[in-house]
Amino acid sequence: ILDSNEEKEALINRTSTQKKLSPYYVNAKPDDIWRPITERIQPPVEFWLKCFMNAQFIITDSFHACVFSILFHKEFVVVGNQKRGLSRMKELLQDFRMEDRLIDEANISDFDISSLHLIDYTLVDKILNERRRYSLNWLMNSLNDKNE
């Protein structure tokens, strides 16, 4: 969670109770000068990625955490974060047919995690592979046009 607040913490607590999981936070608090120094240092990227790899469920408000949740085939929800690029998050989730994973911050207290279905990562991978092929073709065509 990049921009923590009481509603997001309540969602994390509700979800961890329902799923019988213990919340684990990866992000540091660099701006909180009253925190111990160990809580203010950002973890290495490798550690951050390992946490995604090992997570059973992810709650985030970060676009990049949403992307890594998809790449690591994780069950997740993302709280819409107006300050952090909500439109790109909506577009990403629409592209992969995961609109139900987006929680409107205004309705966060009404969100019921048990209403979610498991993500069909076979479909997601198919879409992702199509996007990769398209991107690679575009790149190769662009490079070939420059060489002629």
Model regions and ranges:
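Active-site anion-handling motifs in enzyme catalytic cores
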Residues: I1-E148
